[in-house]
Amino acid sequence: MRGIAVFLAFISLIFASPLTVKSPLVDDFYTAPDGYESAKLGEILKLRKTPSKLSSMFFEIDIKNSWQLLVRSEDSFGNATAIVTTVIEPYNADPSKVLSYQTFEDSANIECSPSYGMQYGAPWSTVATQIDMALMVPMLKQGYYVVSPDYEGPKSTFTVGRQSGKATLDSIRAILKSNKFTGIKSDAKVAMWGYSGGSLASGWAAALQPKYAPELKKNLIGAALGGFVTNITATAEATDGTLFAGLVPNALSGLANEYPEFKEILYQKVSKAATDNLRQGTEHCIGGAILYFAEDQYFTGDDRAFPGGYGLLKEEVVNKTISENNLMQMDKDYLPDIPIFVYHGALDSIVPISNVHVTYKNWCDWGINSFEFSEDLLNGHITETIVGAPAAITWLEARFDGEPVVKGCKKTSRITNFSYPNISDSTSSIFEGILNSVTGSELGPGVTSDNITLDGLTGFLGNFIDLK
């Protein structure tokens, strides 16, 4: 598998566009100014246009404007921090409608941050963000502003729930104060959407909002959560020794970035032979991690990284840390106050659906106002990314249009979520949006132009050959 990783790295060097985007490691914009600790949560500390054009699937997209904001937030323990969030304005945007899209960054490395990875010229290691951009494009095409926060924060705390949720909410606070330059109204409707790792951030934001950001209740209209991560232990168990084993070191490293005692225990318990392997968890974005760590075993097998196997998870510090970041284990104080839509594949072998069933039961028993759960019987984690997206978009559009939500709880099992009611327009919008982004057409409602433009064609070909 290491050979495949080297081969793909070589291929990426051949096809990648010239790297023009400054890394967050050396970009001063990512550094909070002196005295920022005294700023209010959600306050904008810095502002700039994105240094490079944005791209989807590594093709430039034609939008009206985009900005990066450095926003005051806090970590899991209430310590001051600052996160970057990206605001995207399509042509003919509606300033009263905003989608907060949380990407599946799934990495413990700041060079995997969405604000960096969504820019044209970012390295191919950020492919996960580029794939996620393809799901933002349909919403841009329909005139929604899209905001996407670096919710893992400056420490890259993958799987850390409170950090992710707080950052998402503070990003929303910030964009509602950005009218002077973005045009977004302070009373704009805001919905959240995220798949897989993005659902972890979105779910925690929904759970934290009533107490952490109660003033946002008047703006937030719902959250769509796909491949809903509520139990990170279950994902570790499901992926250990599989193609997606890279999620394990990335997740452990993300937790270690936030919890020093947790990190200390990890490196005490890992075998000497696997120490460097574990350290690599801070080096790879999720695409590279899948290749580098494929089929590695951390808790099972004769050569497992942790000789004590799953016994590691019973260590007091480890158990406490993980439990604090499993949304499934939270009590009713974390009950969302906004409408929730969950779509999940029954065959998901990465994020087992059984844990979503537990969360659904808990939230319903505790009296959640609106929870719609659409279970896809024939799809797993990867395929549901695409199959479930039209259902999510349909549900989100209904929220923005003010249509009634499900009262209480409703769970429906479908052969496929392609059969979710009224998704035909949403399905076409996805493929039209992808086509528009690849061909360089302007994104936004009411935009009419030939789908193939000279700039778009040049940009498309420029991904593969040198046109200079």
UniProtKB/Swiss-Prot annotation:
One of its GO terms (cellular component) is extracellular region. One of its GO terms (molecular function) is triacylglycerol lipase activity. It catalyses: a triacylglycerol + H2O = a diacylglycerol + a fatty acid + H(+). Keywords: Disulfide bond, Glycoprotein, Hydrolase, Lipid degradation, Lipid metabolism, Secreted, Signal, Virulence. SUPFAM superfamilies: alpha/beta-Hydrolases (SSF53474). Gene3D superfamilies: 1.10.260.130, alpha/beta hydrolase (3.40.50.1820). Secreted lipase that is able to hydrolyze both the neutral triacylglycerols and the monopalmitate ester Tween 40, allowing the use of hydrolyzed products as carbon sources. Has broad lipolytic activity, which may be important for colonization and subsequent infection, therefore contributing to the persistence and virulence in human tissue. This is Lipase 1. It comes from Candida albicans (strain SC5314 / ATCC MYA-2876) (Yeast).
